[in-house]
Amino acid sequence: AATKYPVGVVAPGAIGHDINVGVRLLGSSVNADLSADQIDTLADTLHEHIPTGSEAEGSLQLTKSEVDHVAQSGAQWALRKDLAQQDDLVRAEEGGRLNDADPSKVSDAARALGAKQLGTLGGGEHFIEINVVEEVFNRAAALTMGLKENTLVAQIHCGSRGYGRQICADYIERFQAVASKHDIDPPSPGLAAVPLDSSEAEDYMGAMCAAANFAYANRQVLAHRVREAFNEVLDGQGEAFHTVYDVAHNLGQIEMHQVEGRHIRCYVHRKGAARAFGPGTPGISLPYRALGQPVLVPGSMGEASWVLLAKRESMEISFGSACHGAGRTMSRHEVSHQGAVSPVDEELEAQDVSIRSGG
């Protein structure tokens, strides 16, 4: 959804609790012909290196001041800590950092969660997958991305963890308290909103960008852990993994778009959507500016994922946005009332997929 800036509203619930949940894709030159034992050892090692589960805590225990540094710097913080390569940032959306972050607008409750959760995957639909490049349709684009058939890639899907969730909860509560002042009656309490030109909106956007930077740093640390695991299992081949792209899903951003023939400054809410800027659009990482922004579409478990490129038409059709995944056949609420579910681990093992989970 998009509104003309600064006429519209901002709603934290419309951006989502998991601010800047997104996907980092790592490509490699590592041949996919691994033995079953190597695959199992790799799965075990990844699980040991990367804390999983909704309450997971990482090895990077930070002070509240350090959390603010992460929130201000994003993936650049990881580069300074030798947890990143320069090219990781070059091939990340916005260089892995939003400039408008304001950690002073973040609560101590959120900081406390961020202090113990950087470098953790989380639970629910968050995942790290090791995949194989099965088929290439555009060889020139694949060459730019460093993708080659029958090589290994890694997908990292996670976000800002409890830090971002607490920020969203804090601002939904705050916006509910001032709704009458702004004469805004949302369709549900979770969609509490304020005008974009209000002080409350300015505070939220500073905090949201802080959470986005935390998420960029989190995916970067996890990429480093993936490299460490491959170094351990495959004799140093972790260094063969490079960032193809890192794309955000749940964000609100100020962008220029053409509407009815006029260039309009818009505030674009992307919830469960990825940015998809067409070729030549400012803001695309330099390696991809001529091609169009990469769009990473993870498939359902056991199904294929896709690496796509945005076309110019996306700017006209969807404010430069695209789907962010395979989608759902039913909601989380419906699933919770479904009763017995199929044994997913058995189904995946039947497809020679090795799975590890942490709750």
Feature map (PLM): residue ranges:
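Domain-length cofactor-binding catalytic modules of enzymes
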Residues: 1, 5-14, 20, 37-359
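Acidic/polar active-site rim loop that often engages polyanionic ligands
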Residues: 21-29
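Patatin-like phospholipase
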Residues: 32
